[in-house]
Amino acid sequence: MMSATSITAPTPRPSASASPGLTALPVDLSHSPVLGIIGVILGAGIVTLAGRLLSLGLADLKGSVGFGADDGAWIPSAFNVALMFIGPFSVYLGGLLGIRKVLFYSAAAFTLISALLSLVHNYALMVGLLAAAGLTSGTFYPLTLTFALKNIPLRYLALVVSLYATCIEGAVNFAPSIYGFCRNNLSWQWIFWIPALLTPVMMACIYFGIPETPKPQTKKQPPSFMGFVFLSAGFALLYAALDQGQRLDWWRSGTFTALFASGMFLLLCSLVRRLRSPNFLVDLPYLRQWNTILLAVALFAYRFVLLATIIIIPQSLSVHGLDAQQYGPSVLWTAIFELFLAFVGALLLSKGFDARLLMATGFAAVAFACLINANFTSAWAPENYFRSELLMGVGQSFAIMGLVASLVQQAAFSGGLSAPQRALTFAAFFHTVRLFGGQVGVAFMGHFIADREKLHSNLLGLHVQAGSWVTDENLRQLAAGLSAKSSGLMAATGRAAEIIASKLRLQAYSLTFIDGFHLVAWACAGILLLTTLLRKAPMNFAQISLLQQEFISTKRKQS
């Protein structure tokens, strides 16, 4: 096993026979790597797209099926909580049944469930099927990337990393335009049918592009799954608490308190179970490494940075009454540009560019884009974001490509690929950080926007007081203009007061979104400092590819 702290820098042409890390290199290679790559990136993008389309189409789904506001709030939560549950549990499933088998059965079930969801009109059945869809699709994230690291030739690894990262990010920004087109030209049911159509393509690519791996070897006694159940259920309940916290008013709600307390109790149970009966499919000590911890923090920060395009920009336009198709172009530019940048990032990595520097460049670009967006006013339209969104696209693409590339290097050179339990533990850990950390960021940003809007409304309201000559003059002028289409002077004055209140609220939101952009910029500045603490990988992607080729040549000569 190789540790990140004990490997010395390699020579430009590393020797295959001298390197002790050769045993971690994948040797069961795909004979159709292009199909394997497509299958991996589809697995990442399908889940992201499905969750985003569900959130965007929630209002239409509730209106068409007849669900109330409170019931509808739990619909996307059912899908996302199930994703959170299956993340840690995928370690058990992948280690016990085999990665390829779990992926195929999960993909088949997800396809069937997605096709049936549009036909469901019963609330309990809808929530149950969405939970099942989350459970089945939640295996795509950790297992597809683990599968790729074990089977894709390393000369394609830079491209796989770039496309995998870009597909996750691009699906988020493509979703508003896709949903807007489907709703206006087709029907809202396509939020379920699109994932159902894409998943069989992923299954075919994995079947023909990646060879079957042998069933993982286990000890004589079967592994226990209770620890996984406790851990997964604990994180899932905490996820649900954070997801509903703002709507339920946090600790003032008994539901939130019960979810949070139950989640913490189950996490404590999983810890006790781990101490009393460790599971050989989980290698927690392997995660106690400097770069692993820092990269987990970086992944959490990146998920928070994404909220600039997931929450702040859409909400800054939706307060004007714009729907998904109308504000979609403001983030669509980012998604289109990222597809081109994926190949640029792959070229840079394949030429030996430092993944840490690529990640730092990306976060710096996002920070500058947020500072440009901090000039936001209530008069902005989607076109005003086009300039900054190009820079945002560069930043988000390079940041996620550098981050995923650093994760791959850390897994390879810390012994993560030398044992199945380490690879699965590594993938499940970062999958959990990505989902749970992302929800922590969403909950914080939602609470931040709500509180800052109240603050700015109160501060602006201090200057709009009854009896002030400025306020009274504005009321009189507006009432005079509205009197012709009002039933009387009192009605016209009431409508004028509503217009002033709406303008006040719009300005309060404008100041809130400016604060949000500044917050994201400061988060980028913090992650830039963190990247300076990351230790350099022993080899870059160009040297890794050369190492594998020499290793395979040596094996062939020996045979």
Identify the role of each PLM range.
Residues 87-227:
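Helix-loop-helix hairpins in multi-pass membrane proteins, especially solute transporters
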Residues 410-417, 429-559:
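Hydrophobic transmembrane architecture of multi-pass small-molecule transporters
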Residues 1-49, 63:
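Cytosolic juxtamembrane N-terminal segment immediately preceding the first transmembrane helix
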Residues 57-85, 125:
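Extracellular/periplasmic helix-loop-helix junction of adjacent transmembrane segments
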Residues 180-298:
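Hydrophobic transmembrane-helix bundles of small-molecule transporters
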Residues 33-50, 54-56, 69-70, 75-76, ...:
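12-transmembrane solute porter fold
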Residues 61-62, 93-94, 126, 178-186, ...:
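Interfacial helix-cap and linker-helix signal at transmembrane-aqueous boundaries
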Residues 77-92, 141-145, 332-345:
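Central cavity-lining transmembrane alpha-helices of secondary-active solute carriers
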